[in-house]
């Protein structure tokens, strides 16, 4: 098991020794030691500006870009290998998603595309958003176990 600072109520360890944190990441990440996590995988809120999916969740963040910059900065500090950061560019956050990609261009090893074969239809005559991005960040190059691995996942 990894050596962690004191993590009371929001830290759980399973039988494999893996640690799961159920808390606001900006409360937990500053408590972690540098390079104390092997891999990080997260999907921040999309900032869709509407609440039609979860009854107790408000998906409005007026400074979405800065929030994500702060989170990725902390993840780069604590993660040894790779960070997988799942984003969707939508009508409300599109400009900020592309600014975020530019901001971390030196840390991005690759961008994997998640192509959805049956996405939620767009309203009106708008183009349906059928993809999400996985930004892969880190300092260690990506490797594959085959000679032909694509960076597109289709579901």
What are the residue ranges of the model-derived segments?
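Core catalytic lobe of class I
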Residues: 1-155
């Amino acid at each position: 098991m990894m050596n962690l600072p004191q993590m009371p109520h929001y830290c759980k360890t399973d039988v494999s020794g893996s640690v799961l944190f159920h808390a606001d990441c900006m409360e937990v990440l500053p408590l972690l030691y540098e390079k104390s996590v092997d891999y990080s995988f997260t999907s921040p809120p999309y900032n869709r500006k509407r609440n039609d999916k979860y009854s107790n969740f408000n998906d409005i963040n007026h400074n979405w870009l800065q929030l994500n910059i702060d989170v990725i900065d902390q993840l780069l500090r604590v993660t040894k290998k790779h960070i997988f950061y799942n984003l969707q560019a939508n009508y409300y956050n599109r400009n900020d998603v592309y600014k975020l990609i530019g901001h971390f261009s030196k840390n991005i090893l690759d961008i994997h595309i998640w192509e959805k074969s049956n996405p939620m239809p767009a309203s009106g005559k708008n183009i349906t958003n059928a993809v999400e991005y996985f930004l892969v960040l880190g300092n260690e190059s990506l490797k594959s176990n085959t000679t032909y691995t694509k960076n597109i996942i289709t579901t």
